[in-house]
């Protein structure tokens, strides 16, 4: 029901329990607000940021390549990177010719980081596929079999 940030996922049980308790408390508040007649939209402000949502994106191959290039950068949030790396992996499986790493990847993987002074300083090897990036940057997901 709740998205657990990778950093919390790999933390100790005490940290995970604290996070889940907070999420559950916020969700209970949301339910109480709805039960008093507050609209779902207004009550949603009480929900935890970690509440899972459904995201629908429609894009052309060119648009996907652009989003993947921006959102798989190591400076992005883990949640965004994991989602976009999984999307990229699925697109690559559908069309390797369109979504190969030399055509679709973080900018650092295609030659040069566009972040300038804000670069993470850890470029992704040019031959890595999205599944390789996921396995290296998020090994717990790989161990648990939760990669796409």
Residue ranges and their predicted role:
Residues 1-148:
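Family-specific signature for flavin-dependent thymidylate synthase
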């Amino acid at each position: 029901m709740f998205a657990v940030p990778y950093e919390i996922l790999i933390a100790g049980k005490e940290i995970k329990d604290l996070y889940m308790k907070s999420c559950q408390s916020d969700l209970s508040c949301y339910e109480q607000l709805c039960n008093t007649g507050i609209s779902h939209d207004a009550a949603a402000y009480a929900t935890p940021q970690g509440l899972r949502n459904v995201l629908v994106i429609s894009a052309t191959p060119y648009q996907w390549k652009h989003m993947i290039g921006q959102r798989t950068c190591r400076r992005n949030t883990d949640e965004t990177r994991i989602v976009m790396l999984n999307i990229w992996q699925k697109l690559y499986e559908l069309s390797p010719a369109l979504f190969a790493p030399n055509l679709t990847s973080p900018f650092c993987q295609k030659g040069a980081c566009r972040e300038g002074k804000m670069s993470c300083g850890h470029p992704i090897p040019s031959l890595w596929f999205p599944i390789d990036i996921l396995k290296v940057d998020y090994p717990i997901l790989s161990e648990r079999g939760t990669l796409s």
